[in-house]
């Protein structure tokens, strides 16, 4: 069981979450530069996010996975510095192609592709060996060779736009308000909160979750059938999805 979080407040809750049965966390951290972080997130709380990550590691919520959305105006600076920091800290870094979630401005032409991210890594001296997508994970992984001054590790890229993995995706997400989403781009949601508050049994909840999973869309947001547009703009932003 994993939790997606921005890390804020995690320093106070990590141990309790671990005791409650949480296995690991995915922390959104788009830069290790405090000013870039503040601009991207619209809040000057980089130090708080970092404390949250450190507390999660101490609580045993490992491996720590760090997610960063690749943005065109910062990727040249962010990619090498964030990978270097992640390797030194033992975090598993995942870059994510910018997806059309919520009402945000988005265009396919503005995407920082997986290939461009790889090119930036190579230009900054990182030696990568492709590992593929083990166990149908969303992220395609690369092994990063160690150097005399830096440990090795892995880095992943979730290329939902330029290298979609819908054909073997088995992921579902429970949102912060109790809605089950079988795809981040899905227009339909399954209300598990109502079942929980209505006293449904574990078996009833599990059955509802299973039925929703069987009807995952064929591809990104294709709730209207196989001839629909492959990308639907969703009504939710990633910050309201959580999960």
Could you tell me what each predicted segment is?
Residues 1-96:
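Radical SAM/AdoMet-radical enzyme domain recognition
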Residues 84, 88, 98-243:
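Auxiliary Fe-S-binding modules of radical SAM enzymes
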């Amino acid at each position: 069981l994993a939790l997606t979080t921005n890390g804020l407040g995690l320093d106070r809750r990590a141990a309790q979450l671990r005791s409650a049965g949480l296995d690991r966390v995915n922390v959104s951290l788009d830069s290790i530069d405090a000013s870039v972080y503040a601009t991207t997130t619209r809040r000057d709380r980089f130090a708080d996010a970092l404390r949250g990550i450190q507390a999660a590691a101490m609580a045993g919520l490992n491996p720590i996975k760090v997610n960063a959305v690749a943005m065109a105006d910062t990727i040249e600076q962010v990619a090498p510095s964030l990978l270097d920091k992640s390797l030194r800290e033992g975090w598993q870094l995942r870059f994510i192609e910018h997806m059309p979630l919520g009402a945000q401005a988005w265009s396919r032409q503005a995407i920082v592709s997986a290939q461009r991210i790889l090119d930036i890594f190579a230009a900054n001296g990182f030696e990568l060996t492709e590992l593929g997508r083990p166990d149908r994970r969303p992220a395609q992984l690369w092994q990063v060779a160690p150097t005399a001054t830096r440990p090795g590790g892995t880095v992943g890229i979730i290329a939902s736009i330029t290298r979609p993995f819908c054909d073997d995706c088995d992921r579902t997400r429970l949102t912060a308000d109790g809605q089950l989403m079988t795809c981040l781009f899905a227009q339909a949601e399954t209300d598990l909160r109502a079942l929980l508050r209505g006293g449904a049994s574990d078996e009833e909840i599990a059955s509802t979750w299973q039925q929703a999973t069987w009807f995952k869309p064929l591809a990104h947001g294709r709730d209207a059938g196989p001839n629909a547009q492959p990308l639907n703009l969703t009504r939710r932003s990633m910050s309201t999805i959580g999960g």
